[in-house]
């Protein structure tokens, strides 16, 4: 599942370096991309969240921590 989440984010966010850790139904996601330049912290998180929204709404993932930064 970690690979699927990483691949979804990499497909949606250009030139992203992505790290995903999943333990049970909790995920920790770190994304670094120049794509985030000029975005607010909330907007960056929304961009990542959109990639996995279906996994959260289905209950597969319950708690998600997102760290999104520019290089």
Language-model regions, residue ranges each:
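N-terminal, polar/charged subdomain of small-to-medium soluble alpha/beta proteins
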Residues: 1-39, 43-71
């Amino acid at each position: 599942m970690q690979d699927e989440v990483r691949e979804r984010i990499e497909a949606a966010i250009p030139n992203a370096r992505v790290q995903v850790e999943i333990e049970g139904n909790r995920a920790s996601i770190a994304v670094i991309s120049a794509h985030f330049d000029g975005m607010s912290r909330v907007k960056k998180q929304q961009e990542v969240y959109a990639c996995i929204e279906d996994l959260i709404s289905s209950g597969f993932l319950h708690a998600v921590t997102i760290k999104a930064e520019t290089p």
